[in-house]
Amino acid sequence: MNKIDEFEVELGYIKDETIQEDCRTMIELLPDYFFLVPASSTGKYHPSYSLGEGGLLRHTKAAVRIGYELLQDPSIGDKYTSIEKDIMLMGLLLHDGLKLGIPREQYTRFDHPILMANYIMEHKADLLMSDEEIDLLCSVIKTHMGPWTKDYNGNEVLEAPKTKYQNFVHMCDYLASRKFLLVPFDDNNRISV
């Protein structure tokens, strides 16, 4: 499997060549399971298209497409610079990259937003983006769970979104997980509209 080919369309939404290249670097570093597992093992929190083999990949593509479409609306997109838009789209592409941890565990890691942000920081030397851009990227990934910041034992684990960037990425992920919003995919896991 060519991991980058899986995101050919989504990478095209990112305009800045440096951010696009860094996104490719991080896609190559995603664990193989990311491309194979469902977004939800129970189906409780995600629509039908994100279940089954490749479901997490499809959920991610839906979140990126939602972000891209919203940013095309001037009433939303004009609030962000072109670089900020690219970083948020990259954040959406990577937000669930370590959903089952690394190495892979059986169930979703509640702290997967932190794991992914830390993974990016571990590979910071391989990236071309500025420190400020990487910090923004990690911040939108760390807070993508929105108000759901407590683990199954009631411990406060995650940060809630505070900035407009963090809230935007959370909103796109949230919309991509709504059961009534069904995104059509073809047999190659590409959005078909």
Q: Where are the regions that the model predicts?
A:
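Acidic/His-rich, divalent-metal-binding segments that scaffold phosphate/diphosphate chemistry
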Residues: 1-104
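Aromatic-acidic/polar surface patches that form glycan- and anion
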Residues: 56, 109, 161
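Histidine-centered active-site/metal-ligand motif
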Residues: 59, 95, 112-113, 144-145
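An active-site-proximal "capping" alpha-helix that borders the catalytic cofactor pocket
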Residues: 63-67, 109-126
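Short, well-ordered alpha-helical segments in soluble proteins
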Residues: 67, 71-74, 101, 120, ...
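Histidine/acidic-rich helix-loop-helix segments that form or flank divalent-metal centers
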Residues: 79, 88, 128-191
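Short, low-complexity, polybasic intrinsically disordered segments
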Residues: 103-107, 156
